[in-house]
């Protein structure tokens, strides 16, 4: 389970049979639908990359959208057709939020499905409609009456720290313990990605580090609370494949 299209795609490309996603932001589901339609349209990672890589001359272009739109549901078709009409310039707007991928142009480095071998595995999986979506945020996550091998929270806790719903380490620790107790299968894991969020919780607030140094600093500074774990066996020991899993038992 995750709240990120990229993590859902990486999991499917790595062999997951089903992925559950949750997000209260309806726009996120429209973006997911557009990404899935792109995968259904193009038989290679290069075709997908042309539309989604931010340094591509065809990034979010209306021309490629005209190829992709027929793989959208009627609701998603109506939404994206409205967005793309009149040549609305998505490239120069903040319509799709700028992230580290935009700043560093890294999405093809941090997501294995941009590799053609794994893209083809992803495409094969996507055609089986393996992604289940829920209209809720992390504070209502216990309404999902399922259990999972991996719950991948990515940077979600950062946002909820800012709005004080998960405002301190003790609150987050209790939340994660309940998450593991109620929703994780035996031997499963709740994973929090620290690859580019240096101030996720207060014990990270003092860090002033670069993207490249962050994993090592956290590992060395908090050896009792953190251990390294690769999200998938397809990764080597480079930064691209490493995330940090918070131990849930003090």
Tell me the role of every PLM-derived stretch.
Residues 191-218:
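Conserved class I S-adenosyl-L-methionine
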Residues 27-127:
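Class I S-adenosyl-L-methionine-dependent methyltransferase module
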């Amino acid at each position: 389970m995750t709240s990120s299209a990229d993590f859902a795609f990486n999991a499917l490309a790595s062999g997951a049979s089903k992925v559950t996603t949750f997000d209260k932001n309806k726009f996120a589901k429209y973006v997911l639908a557009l990404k899935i339609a792109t995968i259904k349209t193009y038989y290679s990672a290069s075709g997908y990359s042309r539309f989604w890589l931010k340094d591509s001359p065809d990034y979010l272009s209306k021309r490629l959208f005209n190829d992709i739109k027929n793989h959208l549901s009627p609701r998603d078709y109506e939404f994206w057709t409205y967005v793309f009409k009149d040549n609305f310039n998505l490239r120069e707007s903040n319509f799709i939020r700028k992230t580290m991928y935009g700043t560093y142009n890294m999405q093809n480095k941090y997501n294995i499905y941009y590799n053609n071998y794994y893209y083809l595995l992803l495409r094969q999986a996507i055609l089986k409609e393996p992604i289940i979506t829920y209209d809720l945020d992390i504070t209502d996550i216990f309404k999902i009456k399922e259990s999972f091998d991996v719950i991948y929270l990515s940077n979600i806790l950062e946002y909820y720290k800012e709005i004080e719903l998960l405002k301190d380490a003790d609150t987050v620790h209790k939340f994660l313990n309940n998450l593991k107790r109620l929703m994780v299968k035996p031997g499963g894991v709740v994973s929090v990605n620290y690859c580019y969020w240096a101030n996720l919780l207060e014990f990270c607030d003092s860090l002033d580090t670069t993207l490249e140094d962050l994993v090592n600093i956290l590992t060395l500074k908090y050896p009792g609370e953190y251990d390294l774990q690769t999200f998938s066996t397809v990764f080597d020991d480079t930064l691209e494949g490493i995330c940090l899993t918070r131990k849930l038992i003090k």
